[in-house]
Amino acid sequence: MTDQVYVTLREDQDKLWNLFHYHKNEMIVTKSGRKMFPKLEYVVRGLTPNKLYAMMLHIEPSDDHRYKFSSGEWVKSGKAEKHREPKKLWHADGVRSGKEWMTNPVCFDRVKITNCAESTNASMIFLHSMHKYTPVMSIYESPSESPFSVPQPSTRLVTSVRLTYTEFIAVTAYQNDAVIKLKIKFNPFAKGFREGSQSDRKRNSPSADDSTTDESSSQVSSPQPKKSRTVSVSPPLMPRILPTMIPPPPAINPLFYSLPYFSHLAATGNFPPVPFQFPFGLPCFSPMSFPTPPPSLKNVKKEEQEDIEQEINVV
């Protein structure tokens, strides 16, 4: 009997995805990878409780077009780049029973999207910037009786789910101000786009006007010369040369001066290296060493590190 599986998003995430979809959602792609927001948290119903399943996610192109943001909206700008076979990622929980999958939402929060085609990170999916994509979750029935087995591509496909309102356009910088406001409002980690950072975003955006000036410069009454965009480079950090640390001479008992050997050393100032091994021939003395503790460089190194950190912070 075929499972009648029903898949949707968790209620709060479902509302967010629909809200973003209304404004044509955008997702940032970077070389180091970026997690998606809103999250993909699927709610699965209809699985056989005692059967074993594995969940897989891939992101496929929504169409064969390239897009650009022009006059406040996304428009088609040509044919899409040649797409490679979508990378498919198994859920980190591996193989679990239908009862376990249906108990909690299936969350793919470890997946990151990147624009680096050479990335070998197992949790990253490569996407072309300025292209539209749709996430797809697939459910496979596992033939193994062990819940600890590794999912295999040959397992039977139960269903694949494509939710049209989860599609998005991959970008290297957000283009739509409405999307930015939604990201700031609902994403607690969108600190890079809080107040005061939108001007920076527009300078990095390929569709923004580079002639825009800062608000502070427009408030100056007298004309000011344009400041050239120069990069402030701090002078190279020179290694600090520590003064030569000479260990103090060992404390010599005055009794030793009566001995010929030590009286000669006291006159010349050439004391034996420490630790000094006393000869067995001297009476009343142990052959154990009497070392003088070396000077501690711990405080010197600590002060040097603090100075370097202060220089780095000032730059």
From Swiss-Prot:
Subcellular location(s) of the protein: Nucleus
Signal peptide positions on this chain: none
InterPro entries: p53-like_TF_DNA-bd_sf, T-box_DNA-bd, T-box_sf, TF_T-box, TF_T-box_CS
Record's compositionally biased regions (Acidic residues): 305-315
GO molecular function (one): DNA-binding transcription factor activity
Annotated GO biological process: cell fate specification; embryonic body morphogenesis; positive regulation of DNA-templated transcription; regulation of DNA-templated transcription; regulation of transcription by RNA polymerase II
This protein's UniProt keywords: Developmental protein, DNA-binding, Nucleus, Transcription, Transcription regulation
Start-end of Basic and acidic residues biased regions: 193-203
Traits of the deletion mutant: RNAi-mediated knockdown causes about 5% embryonic lethality with 1-10% of hatching larvae displaying posterior morphological defects. Defective intercalation of dorsal hypodermis. Simultaneous RNAi-mediated knockdown of tbx-9 causes at least 48% of embryos to fail to hatch and those that do display severe morphological defects and die as larvae. Simultaneous RNAi-mediated knockdown of tbx-9 abolishes muscle expression of vab-7.
SUPFAM superfamilies: p53-like transcription factors (SSF49417)
Ranges annotated as DNA-binding: 11-195
Region Disordered, annotated ranges: 193-235, 293-315
Lipid metabolism is among the record's keywords: no
Summary of the function given for this chain in its UniProt record: Transcription factor. Involved in the control of early morphogenesis of the intestine, hypodermis and body-wall muscle. Involved in regulating expression of vab-7. Appears to have partially redundant function to tbx-9.
Record protein name field: T-box transcription factor tbx-8
Lineage, broadest ranks: Eukaryota, Metazoa, Ecdysozoa, Nematoda, Chromadorea
